[in-house]
Amino acid sequence: MTRIKRGYIARRRRTKLRLFASSFRGAHSRLTRTMTQQRIRALVSAHRDRGKRKRDFRRLWITRINAVIHEMGVFYSYNEFIHNLYTKQLLLNRKILAQIALLNRSCLYTISTEIKN
């Protein structure tokens, strides 16, 4: 029976893995078995946090809008403000409202007084 040499396939796979794990700390960037485990863990975390990022930003936008509304003293709650937006059929999402709240508070004040009436 002739000898079969493994070739470069396994080396190429480990090199690719090593490039992925090169920024990891300690044995996680040196040992092949822990590299594979950390790679799986990193990809799982990345997948989970892509969804979490959306929730976090929405939470941040709501907090900013609520803070500016209370600061202006419109006698509003955030809940009423959003409800009035929907009843008046204004197509402003929370991201846009948060940007307006940061950059142009007087504009948000006029929007809130207009939809309240």
UniProtKB/Swiss-Prot annotation:
Keywords: Chloroplast, Plastid, Ribonucleoprotein, Ribosomal protein, RNA-binding, rRNA-binding
One GO cellular component term noted in the UniProt record for this chain: chloroplast
Subcellular location: Plastid, Chloroplast
One GO-annotated biological process of the protein: translation
Record-level Gene Ontology MF annotations: rRNA binding; structural constituent of ribosome
Superkingdom to which the source organism belongs: Eukaryota
PROSITE patterns for the chain: RIBOSOMAL_L20
Main location: plastid
Residues spanning the signal sequence: none
Keyword Chloroplast: yes
Classification via InterPro entries: Ribosomal_bL20, RIBOSOMAL_L20_CS, Ribosomal_protein_bL20_C
Family statement drawn from the similarity comment of this UniProt entry: Belongs to the bacterial ribosomal protein bL20 family.
Protein task: Binds directly to 23S ribosomal RNA and is necessary for the in vitro assembly process of the 50S ribosomal subunit. It is not involved in the protein synthesizing functions of that subunit.
NCBIfam families referenced in this protein's UniProt entry, alphabetically: rplT_bact (TIGR01032)
Protein name: Large ribosomal subunit protein bL20c
Organism for this UniProt entry: Lobularia maritima (Sweet alyssum)
